[in-house]
Amino acid sequence: MKTTINQVYKHVGEEVTIGAWVANKRSSGKIAFLQLRDGTGFIQGVVVKAEVEESIFQTAKSVTQETSLYIKGIVKEDERSPLGYELAVTDIEVIHEATDYPITPKEHGTEFLMDHRHLWLRSKRQHAIMKIRNEIIRATYEFFNNEGFVKVDPPILTGSAPEGTTELFATKYFDEDAYLSQSGQLYMEAAAMALGKVFSFGPTFRAEKSKTKRHLIEFWMIEPEMAFVEFEENLQVQENYVSFIVQSVLKNCKIELNTLGRDTSKLEQIKAPFPRITYDEAIEFLKEKGFDDIEWGDDFGAPHETAIAEHYDKPVFITRYPTSLKPFYMQPASDREDVVLCADLIAPEGYGEIIGGSERIHDMELLESRLKEHGLDSDAYKWYAELRKYGSVPHSGFGLGLERTVAWISGAPHVRETIPFPRLLNRLYP
């Protein structure tokens, strides 16, 4: 019976056939141990010389790393295995013998591994991170579908920048200039006026010359927008969503978290509601902690975010930032025009901001005024401003960076491990 590694639990005591690759091997005299992977998981195949034909045992001893094969054996329970099962091998059929596989079971430098990213993905650690990434994506769709959101796909080629920044990848669009999207937010606001509650999931591109462990040039974002939703309700959606995906990973990725050595006790504490502090309170807190490099009106750096997050040891919202620090589309607070109704969600354990969100401006005159203040071409944003002309309502939204979220939940030290083929400063290969 042909099966996959993640389904062997259904076949205890039965003989099965699995198509797999040899991840590693070792032998001790009359027994050979093959670490096998098939994309769904890892299992150990045990080949006992006295129980198989001599040719099969010799194949098991000589088979090379990453050789592909069909392997037949009897599924047995094994408490020592992370999977809980092993395969008592009865037959091996080599499909293709791999030679000189470059990523041997020794330590390799980061640049070497990045040059061989197409092969590094096969490792047990990278496999675990990709499975966690997949579970976060799956749980994202489940959460927003359950909450009545409609999936909308904004364009990747745009004629303007949502953030109003210069960190854009430009290209020619026939006789016009176009840019790779930094965010689908403006289009999602239009969709929310048609469909009520919407979300998008797609790639974004930022030409930031940054080499930190938190930054990628190309990354994926989840961007919900909601009509008739004001600031506080927006925060509630965010904390419920983050709590949901964390609990989903804890439930469905136990083997992967164990493979990564992730301390799940910290993740188990991630449940809504999350603490909230204002920007003013954050500045005061940092000064009390001895940070003398920040004043009101300054943005937070990684050390500042880490200090704040460590104090709470769970995700924390920093709210009501100065207007001068944020994009043009954010709604000002009713009691203070110098701050806006926005929040950044800071992940614990030093992973920094994973969500940025706000209530959006819904008054057309105010929006047009903000566009002028930011020096933006009003003609390029005419369609966006027009959303406030025909039945405008309070509305809010946010964007969650997938790779930073994967890094936090999986415990990865750098976001380059959280996307299959990372695009970094000075790295476009493979």
Curated annotation (Swiss-Prot):
GO terms for molecular function: asparagine-tRNA ligase activity; ATP binding; catalytic activity, acting on a protein; nucleic acid binding; transferase activity. PROSITE patterns: AA_TRNA_LIGASE_II. Coiled coil: none annotated. It is found in: Cytoplasm. Pfam families: tRNA-synt_2 (PF00152), tRNA_anti-codon (PF01336). It comes from the Bacteria. Disulfide bonds: none annotated. Its main location: cytoplasm. It catalyses: tRNA(Asn) + L-asparagine + ATP = L-asparaginyl-tRNA(Asn) + AMP + diphosphate + H(+). Its EC number is 6.1.1.22. One of its GO terms (biological process) is asparaginyl-tRNA aminoacylation. The keyword Ligase applies. The keyword Membrane does not apply. GO terms for cellular component: cytoplasm. InterPro entries: Aa-tRNA-synt_II, aa-tRNA-synth_II, aa-tRNA-synth_II/BPL/LPL, Asn-tRNA-ligase, Asp/Asn-tRNA-synth_IIb, NA-bd_OB-fold, NA-bd_OB_tRNA. Keywords: Aminoacyl-tRNA synthetase, ATP-binding, Cytoplasm, Ligase, Nucleotide-binding, Protein biosynthesis. Homodimer. PANTHER family: ASPARAGINE--TRNA LIGASE, MITOCHONDRIAL-RELATED (PTHR22594:SF34), ASPARTYL/LYSYL-TRNA SYNTHETASE (PTHR22594). Belongs to the class-II aminoacyl-tRNA synthetase family. This is Asparagine--tRNA ligase. It comes from Bacillus subtilis (strain 168). The lineage of its organism: Bacteria, Bacillati, Bacillota, Bacilli, Bacillales.
